[in-house]
């Protein structure tokens, strides 16, 4: 029987290619990976504290959380694995907007974002497990500028009623009803959804994998 690419062993006793593990419970990130033909071998939720530290700025926050997610899951793996972690932070200036868990928070976020520019910072991190010593730790941070038009109270009410703000940083989902109110985006659309696809593909292309198996993406 022919072994799968992630389990076929080379002369070193290690597989030609490690398992790819997505350290996220987000269906959006899984869907984005599948969009470019990448299907993780495992999807594991990273149970970490995502609260910003006192005085922590948006960029360092996104980077720290993405690293912690990847490192938390990588530390639990004893097999040859490469763990992909990501985190998205929405900010207005130096202010980090929360993930909206209730209507009051979502409404406050939308009122703040109405008619103004904000930034979406998405960090993506690759961390090898101890069982894949030749893996290369690497990461990218992608910054995207987004501008909402000026929202009326009725439009905010309609967005709240849609319900796709739940659990979203900044209280909206760009792939949902909010798209009708976004006047301009500068940067990576997929990063705003939750995973910058170009940068993620670049990181994966840079990983050392065996020639017989090839990488995850051309």
From Swiss-Prot:
Residues 1-10 have a biased composition (Polar residues). Keywords: Cytoplasm, Hydrolase, Nucleotide metabolism. GO terms for cellular component: cytoplasm. The keyword Cell cycle does not apply. This is dTTP/UTP pyrophosphatase. GO terms for molecular function: dTTP diphosphatase activity; UTP diphosphatase activity. Its EC number is 3.6.1.9.
